[in-house]
């Protein structure tokens, strides 16, 4: 008996729900054009929001791929022509960094984590067998340099301390050089390539494709031990560039401010010469890029939410018109016993259904567009992920529900305020 009564109750409840949803559908489709235009505002708002967020993430990925493997807390210092005369030295003097400067800076600045010198040559030509790769660059480095500009080694290894100590004629070649000299895709390790008349044994292939680099683009760069570079190309004690990273809690800007006076004092440069010492603060550049994308994301949220809010206001206005048109219907319901909360629930349900359905369609279409954009960039050298996170999608759904409820509040309260007698008299 109890089971039978429970079944009857469930059937009644289902019937009530079916009736309510049927009524919502009839109300929304009563004026199809108006409902479509109202829903389109919400659809476009959520579509813009998702596309802007996913698009900004994709662009950020593309930009980040250009900095791939580059230390974000790094800085670089080199020499430049002087702009002031000092202690008998004329203005416009050229000077060079020296090996001694490395030890001077290392002793004076313990906040530097990695400090390594490097030299470079441009316009070199590499040949192997009958194949030739021209317009290459050559870079002499220490093993520590890999912590500043991390190579992507798919074959072989990088320069090590034994290579530097023994002045070995070994090299790591870039991806483009490898593809030109070894078009059959064979393993180049152990093979000797001719670089401007000097033979070097290949020990690795660097396939890094990042567009941010120092002293040469990775795909067209031949990397050799620093000591070999000094010996083979008569650099002596000269250094073209000092590369360094800061320990946690220290900034590159402060380090560079302390490096300058050390170098100026050692090389007889005027203390107020702003040109003689050349500094590049990669940490500041990365910070600017991060701030740029933070600003883009904030702007995307503002534009997307603003458009979505405009759509929700449109829903609210249309629901107000709908309530006005249904004044008599609502009055009759009140007269035959409908509670104010029932009327309010009905209006809110209609508003939320209209908003949610339009919003879900907008999310689906936006995800489809982002997927097409990702497929379109998949074959490029800088692939990007034009996607939104799971939690962003959940957040968008919650925003839709909240806006749908808020859009229906004013019309719902107006419907609750309708008195049966006045509604019938209004008709």
Regions inferred by a protein language model and the residue ranges of each:
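Short cytosolic juxtamembrane segments of multi-pass membrane proteins
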Residues: 28, 412-427
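Transmembrane alpha-helical interface segments in multi-pass membrane proteins
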Residues: 20-29, 33-41, 48, 52-53, ...
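Short helix-coil transition/hinge motifs at the ends and kinks of transmembrane helices
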Residues: 12-14, 83-91, 212-214, 268-274, ...
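Mid-to-C-terminal secondary-structure elements
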Residues: 139, 144-159, 169-270
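Short, membrane-interfacial amphipathic segments enriched in basic
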Residues: 2-22
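Peri-transmembrane interface segments
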Residues: 66, 270-304
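Hydrophobic, regular-secondary-structure patches
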Residues: 57-137, 144-147, 179-180, 230-231, ...
